[in-house]
């Protein structure tokens, strides 16, 4: 691999990291560290499996299917596969992750701007999402290019300064079971929804790699770049999980959706806390824009078969998003938890099956109990 290819590989790894790294995802390692305390290593082990390893394995599995979402899910059968794909993009879009992003934006800003009304804020956020999703806008890309590095830099600063100035008194978990903390981390990783996102990020990633001259070496390129992206994601999650453990005595009574803003204020001060809050807010906004646009595009092409235009679907999507945002972050998370606990194991099994069993002879044949038994 020459110098240019090495640079390309690193750049691609950073790009994949940026795609998976959402501002909202920082909430979950913080919440985990606050719960597991001195058992944080066990919690992290489970969390990293479902929040880091599985999304990148999902990306590799999708890569074997050339990013063809419908073909990937068709292993379950044509109708069940399309139904599951629709459920996944719905949870990522207006029925889950997108309104959760808006609710988190509101919660983070509320620490610096108390009394900010959720309904008015949600209407404004949905209006902005419509403007930026209605037609491709360079501002969205600019926000992504500028805010993602800024957010990562600020979060790294919080981690470093947080470790340097961490309080001497730490709490110990009242639950001595390592297994229960591992399981908590495993299920908390579901909340990042990154495995779900991997299926719909893959076509974007693969389209950027299409180069006939590199096809023979593409597998190694993607694997190395994925390892780079996964390693960066893991380091950030580990840092914030341990920060929440170290600062747990000062975070008592703070809701999960306000943990990031609260810890930023404690470590960097109130003024820096506002900067972090605004940065995270815009980062969440760009994530919500991408998710809603992906949902509307999927419904238009795969469900409605172009019979209904993009704009009406986008408007309906945002009306649903607004309605669910009013439930607030905690309630949205409580609704998503049981759904993710059912979906994730199925998607993990489907991912491994597609990763190790794809063949040109049976790509379109759905999984049967006999095939599944042979695979296991």
Regions of interest found by a model, annotated:
Residues 11-21, 90, 159-168, 175-243, ...:
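Hydrophobic, membrane-embedded alpha-helices of multi-pass small-molecule transporters
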Residues 53, 57-58, 150-161, 224-248, ...:
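Selective recognition of specific alpha-helical transmembrane segments in multi-pass small-molecule
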Residues 31, 65, 80-113, 281-301, ...:
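Hydrophobic transmembrane alpha-helices that form the core helical bundles
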Residues 94, 98, 152-177, 195-196, ...:
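Hydrophobic alpha-helical segments and their helix-loop junctions in multi-pass secondary transporters
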Residues 5-16, 41, 78-91, 120-124, ...:
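Select transmembrane alpha-helical segments in multipass membrane proteins
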Residues 2, 37, 65-93, 110-118, ...:
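Transmembrane-helix boundary/entry motifs in multi-pass membrane transporters
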Residues 69-76, 235-285, 301, 329, ...:
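TM-loop-TM module centered on a large, flexible mid-protein loop between adjacent transmembrane helices
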């Amino acid at each position: 691999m020459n110098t240019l290819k090495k640079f390309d590989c690193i750049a691609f790894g950073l790009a994949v990291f940026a795609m998976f790294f959402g501002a909202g995802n920082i909430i979950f390692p913080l919440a985990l560290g606050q719960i597991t305390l001195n058992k944080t290593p066990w919690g992290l082990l489970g969390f990293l499996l479902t929040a880091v390893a599985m999304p990148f394995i999902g990306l590799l599995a999708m890569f074997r299917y050339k990013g063809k979402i419908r073909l990937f899910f068709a292993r379950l059968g044509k109708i069940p596969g399309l139904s599951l794909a629709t459920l996944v993009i719905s949870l990522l879009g207006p029925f889950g992750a997108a309104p959760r992003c808006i609710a988190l934006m509101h919660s983070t800003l509320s620490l610096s701007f108390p009394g900010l009304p959720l309904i008015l804020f949600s209407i404004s956020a949905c209006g902005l999402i419509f403007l930026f999703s209605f037609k491709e806008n360079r501002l969205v890309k600019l926000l992504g290019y500028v805010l993602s590095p800024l957010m990562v830099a600020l979060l790294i600063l919080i981690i470093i300064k947080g470790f340097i100035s961490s309080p001497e008194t730490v709490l110990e978990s009242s639950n001595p079971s390592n297994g229960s903390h591992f399981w908590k981390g495993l299920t908390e990783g579901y909340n990042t929804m990154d495995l779900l996102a991997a299926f719909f990020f893959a076509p974007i990633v693969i389209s950027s790699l299409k180069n006939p001259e590199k096809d023979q070496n593409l597998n190694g390129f993607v694997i190395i770049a994925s390892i780079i992206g996964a390693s960066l994601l893991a380091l950030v999650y580990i840092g914030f999980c341990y920060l929440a453990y170290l600062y747990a005595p000062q975070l008592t009574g703070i809701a999960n959706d306000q943990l990031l803003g609260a810890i930023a204020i404690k470590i960097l001060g109130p003024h820096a806390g506002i900067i972090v809050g605004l940065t995270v807010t815009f980062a969440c906004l760009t994530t919500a824009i991408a998710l809603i646009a992906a949902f509307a595009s999927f419904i238009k092409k795969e469900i409605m078969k172009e019979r209904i235009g993009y704009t009406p679907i986008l408007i309906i999507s945002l009306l649903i998003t607004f309605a669910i945002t009013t439930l607030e972050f905690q309630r949205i998370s409580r609704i998503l938890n049981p759904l993710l606990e059912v979906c994730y194991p199925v998607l993990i099994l489907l991912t491994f099956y597609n990763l190790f069993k794809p063949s040109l002879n049976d790509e379109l044949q759905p999984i049967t109990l006999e095939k599944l038994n042979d695979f296991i």
